[in-house]
Design a protein with these regions (language model features):
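DPxDG-like acidic metal-binding loop motif
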Residues: 88-143
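N-terminal subdomain of lithium-sensitive/metallo-dependent phosphomonoesterases centered on the IMPase/IPPase/PAP
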Residues: 1-99
């Protein structure tokens, strides 16, 4: 957890409110794609471990969010669940789970969403989770 001086250090280096909006927008991008593709036939494959699935929708959401983040924050690293890390040698890293609940989604169960986080030196500072079924967006930002 951050001390107040560390929170001030982060706030002095980045525009937290702007990054917070970008995180929420990213989660909403995922939300819209998940809604459009829900209950449609999709390509499903295994990522290795039994029950660890990936669908074409996971990949589509991840790609759209990465495009958006690279456009809005080109100097921030990205760690995406399906494609790995795009390292920019930054203290900041976006973490993307494009379809949190792939098994539920692929079986037609409505409990899934998109999760986005921003970490600073391996400490979480921003998080946003969209849940299409509930039409909700949950989010938090350190210091705001």
């Amino acid at each position: 957890m951050f001390e107040s001086s560390e929170t001030e250090e982060i706030a002095n280096q980045v525009n937290l409110s702007s990054l917070y909006e970008i995180a929420k927008n990213s989660a909403q991008i995922g939300n819209e794609i998940l809604k459009i593709n829900y209950n449609k036939i999709q390509k499903i494959s295994s990522k290795g471990r039994k029950g660890d699935l990936v669908t074409n929708v996971d990949l589509e959401v991840e790609n759209k969010i990465k495009e958006y983040l690279l456009e809005e924050t080109p100097n921030i690293s990205i760690n995406a669940e399906e494609s790995g890390t795009l390292n920019k040698s930054s203290d900041l890293t976006w973490c993307i789970d494009p379809l949190d609940g792939t098994t539920n989604y692929s079986h037609g169960y409505p409990f899934f969403g998109t999760s986005i986080g921003l970490v600073y030196k391996n400490n979480p500072i921003i998080g946003a989770i969209s849940v299409p079924y509930l039409n909700e967006l949950y989010s938090a930002c350190i210091g705001l």
